[in-house]
Amino acid sequence: MAPMSIADLVAALPAEDTWGPATPSDNMLDGVPYAPFSKGDKLGRMADWTGDGKDRDRGGRQAYNRNYRDQQVYGAGTSSLFNIQVAEDESSFSVVDNTRTSTKRTFARGGGTVFRGRGQRGVGQRGGRAGFQRVGAGRGQGGDRYYDNRSARGNRGRRFGWKDYDKPQRTREPSVNVRPDWTMLEEVDFNRLSKLNLEAPEGEDLDSYGFLYYYDRSYDKAPVKNAERKLQALERAAYNVTTSQDPVIQELAEKNEATVFATSDILSMLMCAPRSVYSWDIVIVHQGDKIYFDKREGASIDLVTVNENAADAPMETTDSSGKQESINTPSALALEATFINHNFALQTVVESEESKVTFSHPNPFYNAAEETEPLASKGYKYRRFDLSLQGDEEPLNMIVRTEVDAVMKNPVGGEDQQLIVKALNEFDSKAPGSGGALDWRSKLWSQRGAVVATEMKNNSIKLARWTTQAILAKADAMKLGFISRANPRSATSHVILGVVGYKPREFAAQMNLNLGNGWGIVRTIVDRIRSLDAEEEEDKVKKYVLIKDPNRPVIRLYSVPPNTFEEDDEAAEEQEEKAEEESEE
């Protein structure tokens, strides 16, 4: 047989076939799909069920670098979860602090701090001519519920972020519990309230009561370092009577001087409602054609909140026994701030009988035969505002009892300037709940604008209410004191770091405070009450309660029985009288 060459062998092969493995790749192995892989790949898991889905291409350059940049080219999974974990990975290691924390003493535990003197009838005292203003609720009937834990970003709440599921959710209790015999009539969210508007009326003075001392202008000077003045606790007779118990308002109502009656502290809360976060309540009494905006006995509306609008507001902390263990809780801070405001207004005036300014009538709530403490500097101005619209058949007038705290000589001459005096307080700039505030001792005079701007953000509702009260009273200026604790761990001693003055209208513009929106809210509530009782008998007394929801930016209007809260008031009075008798013994 003749030998064959390689060329002959190749030529003898079929032309349609090729030598070697098949060129098309088959992704099926015995009917099971599989993906090509490299034996050099280290697989940590059989499958990745946690990989990104439709959002894998979102996130921009950083997301691309994080997800795709350093992956293996051949045979790698689409997530780093396919990579084997290093045995000595310490990324999840953390250090636990097991040091003991010292227990802090609570400010005014077990009740409210009382402005010293006899009477002690509470904040919303009954009987127009008796009782001192009380700082706290005192009776423990839910006054502290108003300041329970809050959501993080004011009345808007906030969206959840990384690991927020693992954080304790903040919930608050209502300022007053809704009873079974109450009927809800209306629910309005703050977005709707913010759209209301009524041209702000100027108002006119009807009468004035009380007297004022002159403001001590030495407090306007920057204090010497480490030589600040201490805040003093002064014994003065101060009154905070609700609307329907005011004898002057009762007299004006009998003369048909107006249809709606209120006090500036109650009205300011209603006008600034969209800025509020904590729960509050207002009692509305409709008797005949008269409407009274009242506050109940022990209402939290009179307490001064602290950092209510801060992104990280103070929280309630309780131990296993349920007792408050911190002086920086919302309820403790509110008692402290109310005490500071009362005493600061008394301390910053020059008590001189020769130079005081006396109004047309004496203080309507003071009885010299019964009281032993001297009367505090306070002027009450009863002012009337026209809330009428063009389509109204009859005018709608509102009388408001406004307050001023002091007078000051006009620096350019002319009439004396009337002032309202308020105080902002710093508890601890490094503590939780401080809202990122600057250290007042070092920054108040060098960065005053930044300090005030931070307070506008953290205490929006408080400053808005004070500004509204000043405008309602037609005050010429506001004096804001900056007061800090002498020791951050003690709530009993305070120092005055400085005082800053503002004109109310200019301060309102800086805060973006729209009084037209506030008057629109008031007129809307009044119209709703009048429409509900349009078919009722004239002499029939109807009572309503307006409540701010503790956890949502919503207010609700309830119809309640006429005797609601009266039994609580009588029980509180009996308890206070019994306590007075025991103290005298």
Curated annotation (Swiss-Prot):
Keywords: Cytoplasm, Initiation factor, Protein biosynthesis, RNA-binding
Annotated spans, Disordered: 43-62, 109-152, 560-585
BP term (GO), one: cap-dependent translational initiation
Biased composition (Basic and acidic residues): 43-60
Annotated region (RNA gate), positions in chain: 300-314
Presence of keyword Transcription: no
Molecular function terms from GO: mRNA cap binding; translation initiation factor activity
Cross-referenced InterPro entries: eIF3d (IPR007783)
Biased composition (Acidic residues): 565-585
Subcellular location: Cytoplasm
Biased composition (Gly residues): 109-130
GO cellular component: cytosol; eukaryotic 43S preinitiation complex; eukaryotic 48S preinitiation complex; eukaryotic translation initiation factor 3 complex, eIF3e; eukaryotic translation initiation factor 3 complex, eIF3m
Biological role: mRNA cap-binding component of the eukaryotic translation initiation factor 3 (eIF-3) complex, which is involved in protein synthesis of a specialized repertoire of mRNAs and, together with other initiation factors, stimulates binding of mRNA and methionyl-tRNAi to the 40S ribosome. The eIF-3 complex specifically targets and initiates translation of a subset of mRNAs involved in cell proliferation. In the eIF-3 complex, eif3d specifically recognizes and binds the 7-methylguanosine cap of a subset of mRNAs.
Family membership noted in the UniProt record: Belongs to the eIF-3 subunit D family.
Subunit and partners: Component of the eukaryotic translation initiation factor 3 (eIF-3) complex.
Domain remark in the UniProt entry: The RNA gate region regulates mRNA cap recognition to prevent promiscuous mRNA-binding before assembly of eif3d into the full eukaryotic translation initiation factor 3 (eIF-3) complex.
Name of protein: Eukaryotic translation initiation factor 3 subunit D
Taxonomic source organism: Neosartorya fischeri (strain ATCC 1020 / DSM 3700 / CBS 544.65 / FGSC A1164 / JCM 1740 / NRRL 181 / WB 181)
